[in-house]
Amino acid sequence: MTSSGKIRIYELSKDLSLDNKDVLDAARKLAIAAKSHSSSISSLEANQIKDFLKKSNTINTTIKSSKNLDKQILSVKKNPVKTQKDQKTEPKKKNHDQTELSQAKLNTLLKPSQTLIKSQGSSQANNQKALKNKFPAKQQITSPSKPNKPLPPNPRVEVKPIISKPLTQAERAIPQSEQKKDGQFINQPKRSELAKKSIGQPKQINPQEPKRPLAPPSRPKIDIQDKKPLQPNNQKAKTRINQGEISPQKVGQGNIQKIKSQNKQNAPSRTPQPPTKGNTLELVGAPIRKEKPVNKPHTNEVRNKPVMPSRPGAPKPPTAANRQGLSNRPGSNNRIGGTGRPGSPNRQGPNRGGVANRTTQGQNRPGANNRAGAPVRSGSPNRGGMQNRPGVPTRSLGGPNRSNNRPGVPSGMRKPVAPSELMQLQKPQARPNAPQRKTDSPTSLRPKRENSTGARPPVNRPTPAAPKKPAHRPGGTAAAPRRTGRPDWDDSAKLDALRNKSPQKQRQKVHIIGENDDALTAERGGFAGEQQAVVLSASLARPSKPKVGKRNNGKPLTALKKRKKETTRQRQRRRAMELRASREAKLVRPEMIVVPEDNLTVQELADMLSVESSEIIKSLFFKGITATVTQSLDLATIETVAEEFGVPVLQDDVEEAAKKTVEMIEEGDLKYLIRRPPVVTVMGHVDHGKTSLLDAIRKARVAAGEAGGITQHIGAYQIETEHDGSTKKLTFLDTPGHEAFTAMRARGTRVTDVAILVVAADDGVRPQTLEAISHARAAKVPIVVAINKIDKEGSSPDRVKQELSEQDLLSEEWGGDVVMVPVSAIKGENIDKLLEMVLLVTEVEDLQANPDRLAKGTVIEAHLDKAKGPVATLLVQNGTLKSGDVVAAGPVLGKVRAMVDENGSRIKEAGPSCPVEALGFSEVPTAGDEFEVYPDEKAARAVVGERATDARAARLAQQMASRRVSLSSMSGQASEGELKELNIILKADVQGSLEAILGSLEQLPKDEVQVRVLLSAPGEITETDIDLAAASGAVIVGFNTSMASGAKRAADANGVDVREYEVIYKLLEDIQLAMEGLLEPEMIEEALGVAEVRAIFSIGKSAVAGCYVTNGKIQRNCRARVKRGKQIVFEGDLDSLKRNKDDVKDVSTGFECGIGCDRFANWEEGDQIEAFKLVTQRRKLNN
């Protein structure tokens, strides 16, 4: 019991001596919430469960079943009859209660504890088990739905049977056949369980011993008044039994008395035994071999054969009517007392368990030759075959479940032929409709197959060898007749033999007759007809391959000769043609490739560029890079290779950044939507006139005040224009065109409604133009093309249209759907037409928003102002932003203190599609994040807290990435101390500039110098930054920012290098120069002159060369290289230089001199002396 006074399920089950699942089952029925054995319930609920279990007598049943466990071995509990006292006191059970009892009993039958086999037992216990085994079919009628249900208690009927010998082990192994196989129950015949007694040890059971009816009161009964067993024509009764309407218990009572009468006689007889009662069923089976192991249940499951009822009108002995054993194999005979297995000796005495008498097989198998005098052993156990038991579903191994009492096959279908007849001589007859054959003898039975259970597994049934050379196969097409007039050595005869090899193999197989054979023989003309015998498994009854018609004996075999095997030369020629075709298909180069995750293998890059991988490897080899087809390339290398093939490269994550991810309009806004101004983004290549076009639209001069004449920020403006007699508002976003500001362009595309693509008429389509097109397509926004600079000389708008058409942007004038307007930003031509086209396109888009809700939108740009603090440029996309609103922008929380429009005027609220600068954020938000206004600060803080954790993890990952040094870049340099690092601290004015600079730094080569960004943040340079730079030896780089008070003095005192830039070009160039300054200078050769040896003077052991200077001049103590022809014979220092026996420093062109080297004296006339010196040179980064 818990501290709160509740009781756990396992405690309650322990008190009640029950399993946890029983208590959980009761709780579920009482609608008490209990999920597992450790769940807690109240005392009231525990008392309800106890009362429920006491009413259902589950506790008593469990205790009693544990005590009588030895008496329940391999038995199926029947539903005992209640006494008169119980019938008076207990209410009548409903049908569904009986179903639950049946299911519980079936579960009891399958428990492992009841499958144990005991070697000894008392006769009284065995007799009681025999009574319980009379009714196994009752539990099998109802499919089990709740197998774990406990057994409800029922009073047992004490029966005093006649004492006889104890049961054998084979009897106690019967219920093992009813185990689970492949998720289904293989139900054994009811009579086979009673017939498992030994012939020499019969049991006498008095069927009239119980005084009360054995079936439950609510179960309907049926009286079988026919003297015969159940026949196929009695379909109504069989159907009722199969459907569970009729209890088969009375049928089982007759079996007991029949066994008693048969065991008394215990003699073989061919005549049927007279029944003692009208409702009895007769049992005929094979005797049991005692030496057969009894603990293998698969012997019962594998040796089952379906019952084949007799054909209407055919005589049928009542004792062996429903007996069906194993099928007769080809060449096997039915012998008296033998098993009839081909290839095995016939034994006298009882048959093996599970193997039926072959006499009954011959009677039930069509076309079998039954020998006269083969006795029917009455009273022998029927372990092998499935009996005609009503209501018990059977399952064939490998086949579907079917009813035992299957209706007979229509008369138009051909009857199956026994395998023994397949191998016999038959007269060739033309039987296209496959008529039925007459019975071979008046005593042979040809019953229709009623409860066929499919094919038997061939594991325990070895296939006998069929005759390899049958005497004659009339009408068969398996073996073609030998061609006449051809010698034995003829090749065609050998080809015939090879061709007929496969049918001969088929002929050696044994046909397994299944339940689908009737339909198949009707379709194929019979097994023993004109066509070849078909070997078919009943569980794999599928449409066979179409048969080849009869071949004309007179025609030569030419079809096989035409099939020539492909030679090696033909295969090589075919492969060369396929390779040539694939290369021709790859000649078309793509306009642009998208690189996912900043790396590609050589093979992937070759596929994208539509070139061979060897071309990529050759290109890299010329750059000093050894690569294989599986080696990964970084983005810089990919761009270098792609430039050689004239294909620009675009990063995949940049295109993903342009996609719209958040839907600003919610379901609750649909009723209050109104039209909103469109958001237009101006995009294009650098210096194509985007800002000048906006200046012409706004009638301002923004471009004149930009540093370097290029845009480095994203600007947002709102203008008003006249359209259709009314004033329309347009919101414009100006994006940078430089390649470093890719993220800015993607951010602008994500919030836009229409994209204006500016293309210079004199420059055409450029890389950033292609990137802008990809951004617009990723955001799924319409494109309006503005062909600018039409007033310049050499401009060609038609050429621009042609280049754009290659990018699937076809002008309306050429039959496309893209609006293209030629404009001049300087002269203001066609500006009004451009605005009109933009408004027309946006009207089609039907842009709407709900102004009467809390604002939602996107952070376009953000920066840190030294006077105002964090400032964010916000674009309201839905709702209205007001002063005082609590805003959460990503992980940053803020409260709007003031809002300023693009002109610097203060405003109190901003509606949809309105760009504003908002003040009041706790820190600088990240550009590109979505912002949302919350009703109170508490709700906003809850959202911001979760986002801050994610942002902190992302920031840490970025810092680790900045310190990452790849193994390939380190190689052997780290061990030699040659790996250099450049530490920088980056401060910029806005967040977008930081993104652009960091992205550009990533593109710099890092093979020998690693750029390590210690800190990157928007805002001015402070004293804290100076201290960090002094401690780490870093360089401070400022972009469009200023230094705080005291920072300049601190930098001078600490000797920190602070660089300030306004244009990104200069910043990146200086950082690259600083990286190159860290590299060790390299030594290069500088040529001085060339001299020719014309005479040789020996001086002691050494020699001096008399030379003539032909080019340049020769200096003393310089480096010299002696070449003899094309071979270098010496390279070293020039130690002595004389002219007219005087030492000189140098000798110019046209003069003679004497040259001597201390380490070389092997001069020859005609040698060339090249003089050079080594000088140091500043190294550059390897691109």
From Swiss-Prot:
Residues at which GTP binds: 684-691, 734-738, 788-791
GO molecular function list: GTP binding; GTPase activity; translation initiation factor activity
The keyword GTP-binding belongs to this UniProt entry's keyword annotation: yes
Compositional bias of kind Basic residues: 544-553, 560-574
InterPro entries noted in UniProt: EF-G-like_DII, IF2_II, IF2_N, P-loop_NTPase, Small_GTP-bd, T_Tr_GTP-bd_dom, TF_IF2_bacterial-like, TIF_IF2
Family: Belongs to the TRAFAC class translation factor GTPase superfamily. Classic translation factor GTPase family. IF-2 subfamily.
Name of the featured protein: Translation initiation factor IF-2
Record's keyword terms, sorted: Cytoplasm, GTP-binding, Initiation factor, Nucleotide-binding, Protein biosynthesis
Region (G5): 824-826
SUPFAM superfamilies: Initiation factor IF2/eIF5b, domain 3, P-loop containing nucleoside triphosphate hydrolases, Translation proteins
NCBIfam families cross-referenced by the UniProt entry: IF-2, small_GTP
Region ranges (Disordered): 65-512, 540-579
Organism encoding this protein: Prochlorococcus marinus (strain NATL2A)
Entry function: One of the essential components for the initiation of protein synthesis. Protects formylmethionyl-tRNA from spontaneous hydrolysis and promotes its binding to the 30S ribosomal subunits. Also involved in the hydrolysis of GTP during the formation of the 70S ribosomal complex.
Annotated segments matching region G1: 684-691
Superkingdom to which the source organism belongs: Bacteria
Region (G3): 734-737
Localisation: Cytoplasm
Biased composition (Basic and acidic residues): 83-99, 220-229, 288-304, 485-499
Region listing for G2, in residue ranges: 709-713
Entry's Gene Ontology cellular component terms: cytosol
